[in-house]
Design a protein with these regions (language model features):
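Conserved ABC ATPase "signature" region
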Residues: 110-126
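Helix N-cap at the start of a conserved alpha-helix in ABC-type nucleotide-binding domains
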Residues: 166-168
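ABC ATPase NBD coupling module
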Residues: 70-84, 181
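Helix-to-loop junction immediately C-terminal to a conserved catalytic motif
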Residues: 54
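Catalytic Walker B motif of ABC-type/P-loop ATPase nucleotide-binding domains
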Residues: 155-158
Length: 225
């Protein structure tokens, strides 16, 4: 079977922040229906790359293509629905979970919000939970459910389990695999190499703003600790 064409492809991308080069000549491909791990030391440029993928930051050079189309030709709002970013510390708006899920949507149906919660392994009762009373694991899953209400093709997760206990982290790992099984391209930033080996098929290693290796997890992260 021929390899699947990437849903997201980066070519020659360089970025500058505060007069410092944070990404240099980055090239990578993210296939659909796959969990890809983005690894590397702190300060390697991982979060900067995620921000460039959704045009929160504009690169100095290079391009990002979504399903073959340059993202610079897409409306930013449409891009961020198709490529959803969940930050490491997702912000919850005042009010209940329903208000958070519905934010930015045009008259969402209750069934759509419940469906997103259920994919994130949360029941319909969560719609009425105060957002400021969620546990860390619940907050992470609600943030992912909020992204799913936009029906994205690509989900970017910035260290989604960094501050969670083992049980909550396992729930997020199971969710990542479930989403990839439903056809989403999942790109997750993580420092947990054991997690990489559990959930990812492919890995990309960034160091000093450059891609040092990419490919199957065994080849990229197999010998790292």
């Amino acid at each position: 079977m021929p390899p699947q064409a990437p849903i997201l492809a980066v070519h020659g991308l360089s970025a500058i922040r505060a007069r410092r080069v944070v990404l240099e000549d980055v090239a990578l491909e993210i296939p659909a229906a796959t969990v890809t791990a983005l690894i590397g030391p702190s300060g390697a440029g991982k979060t900067s790359l995620l921000r460039c993928l959704v045009r929160l930051d504009e690169p100095a050079e290079g391009s990002v293509r979504l399903d073959g189309a340059d993202v610079r030709g897409l409306d930013a709002g449409l891009l961020r629905r198709r490529v959803a970013l969940v930050a490491q510390a997702p912000v919850m708006l005042p009010g209940d979970v329903r208000a958070n899920l519905a934010y930015g949507l045009d008259a969402p149906r209750e069934a759509e919000l419940v469906a997103a919660l259920e994919v994130a392994d949360l029941d319909a009762d969560f719609l009425h939970r105060p957002a400021d009373r969620l546990s860390g694991g619940e907050r992470a899953r609600v943030a992912i459910a909020r992204a799913l209400t936009r029906s994205p093709e690509v989900l970017l997760l910035d260290e989604p389990t960094a501050s969670l206990d083992a049980r909550a982290a396992t729930a997020i790992e199971v969710l990542m695999l479930r989403l990839a099984g439903r056809g989403l391209a999942v790109l997750v930033v993580t420092h947990d190499l054991a997690q990489v080996r559990r959930v990812a098929t492919r890995a990309v290693r960034l160091e000093g703003g450059r891609v040092r290796a990419q490919g199957l997890v065994a080849a990229v992260a197999g010998s790292e600790r």
